UniProtKB/Swiss-Prot annotation:
It is a multi-pass membrane protein. Residues 53-67, 128-140, 202-220, 281-312 are cytoplasmic. It comes from Mus musculus. Keywords: G-protein coupled receptor, Membrane, Receptor, Transducer, Transmembrane, Transmembrane helix. One of its GO terms (molecular function) is G protein-coupled receptor activity. Gene3D superfamilies: Rhodopsin 7-helix transmembrane proteins. Orphan receptor. Probably involved in the function of nociceptive neurons. May regulate nociceptor function and/or development, including the sensation or modulation of pain. SUPFAM superfamilies: Family A G protein-coupled receptor-like. It is found in: Membrane. PANTHER family: MAS-RELATED G-PROTEIN COUPLED RECEPTOR (PTHR11334), MAS-RELATED G-PROTEIN COUPLED RECEPTOR MEMBER B3 (PTHR11334:SF31). GO terms for cellular component: membrane. This is Mas-related G-protein coupled receptor member B3. Residues 1-31, 89-106, 162-180, 242-259 are extracellular.
Length: 312
């Protein structure tokens, strides 16, 4: 993805040396911040993976959140490696693994967007048709959907790496254009569906004829979707636009494009803290409890008065 690599090799005339120097300084500062922040998000996601994978009984939504944590970890890992190589000025080494880092980054982003959309849809279904959802929903739906989304999310970046790679001399203009159109269309579909079901869910909870009790799971999902709509979708939109306008990329990168990438990186780190915040607050106050109990409460699908929880 040219989105974060043009500053590595771009040069400019002397008359623009000052603006370019400022741009490079900003770029390096953002990478230093990424090296500092990304490991925090990676550790938080590892904690989520450990407890949801081995310590807590899974349900439909915990399976999705588990896979979402994997995608967030992959994104942060790829991004932190890129930032480390830039800060250490290992540009030669980065030249050879750039395509792999870009593939992992977009793979993780597309999967994260896809799984968040599915979570929003299922949350909407569970509220609008609770009896059908809890009684008739196939048992292994979550596992099947996750496998399909992993495969589909890997397909587009893998095809781009195969057909659009200059490094491996496999660039095919016609195929590359088709792949970009299809992947861009898929992202647009995800954007529209996510926004639509999020709006339906909000209206159903706040304006429905019957009062629907809000659960911690609803709050957790709502916060994640809100942050994705604010910080995640701009990253995807810019990626789509960038695929069709790379001639003046240096100017755009120096302006705001890499800011979008790093803001989304920070957003992923914040996402991991949502579970701990939602799970640890009770009656407007933070409660002292184990991490396992905090995560259990964060994905609790029943209201507190009906869930039988015995927090301190």
């Amino acid at each position: 993805m040219a989105l974060r690599t043009s500053l590595i090799t771009t040069t400019a005339p002397d008359k623009t040396s000052l603006p370019i120097s400022i741009c490079i300084i900003k770029f390096q500062v953002m990478n230093l911040l990424s090296i500092t922040i990304s490991p925090v998000g990676m550790v938080l996601n590892i904690i989520v993976l450990w407890f949801l994978g081995f310590q807590i009984c899974r349900n439909a939504f915990s399976a999705y959140i588990l896979n979402l944590a994997v995608a967030d970890f992959l994104f942060l890992c790829s991004h932190s490696i890129f930032s480390f190589l830039i800060v250490c000025k290992l540009h030669y080494f980065l030249f050879y693994i750039r395509q792999l880092l870009d593939t992992v980054t977009m793979f993780a982003y597309v999967f994260g967007l896809s799984i968040t959309t599915i979570i929003s849809i299922e949350c909407c279904l569970s509220i609008m048709w609770p009896i059908w959802y809890h009684c008739q929903r196939p048992r292994h739906t979550s596992a099947v959907i996750c496998v399909l989304l992993w495969a589909l999310s890997l397909l587009f970046p893998a095809l781009q790496m195969e057909k659009c790679s200059v490094l491996f001399n496999t660039f095919e203009y016609s195929w590359c254009g088709i792949i970009n159109i299809i992947s861009g269309a898929w992202l647009v579909v995800l954007f529209v569906v996510l926004c639509g079901f999020s709006l339906i869910l909000l209206l159903r909870i706040s304006c429905g004829s019957q009062q629907i009790p809000v659960t911690r799971l609803n709050v957790t999902i709502a916060l994640r979707v809100l942050l994705l709509l604010i910080f995640g979708i701009p990253f995807g939109i810019f990626w789509i636009v960038d695929k069709w306008n790379e001639e003046n990329f240096f100017v755009r990168a120096c302006g705001f494009s890499h800011h979008i990438l790093y803001v989304y990186c920070i957003n992923i780190c914040v996402n991991a803290t949502i579970y701990f915040l939602v799970g640890s607050i009770r009656h407007g106050k933070f409660q002292k409890m184990t991490l396992k109990l905090i995560l259990q409460r964060a994905i609790q699908g029943t209201p507190e008065e009906e869930g039988g929880e015995r927090g301190p």
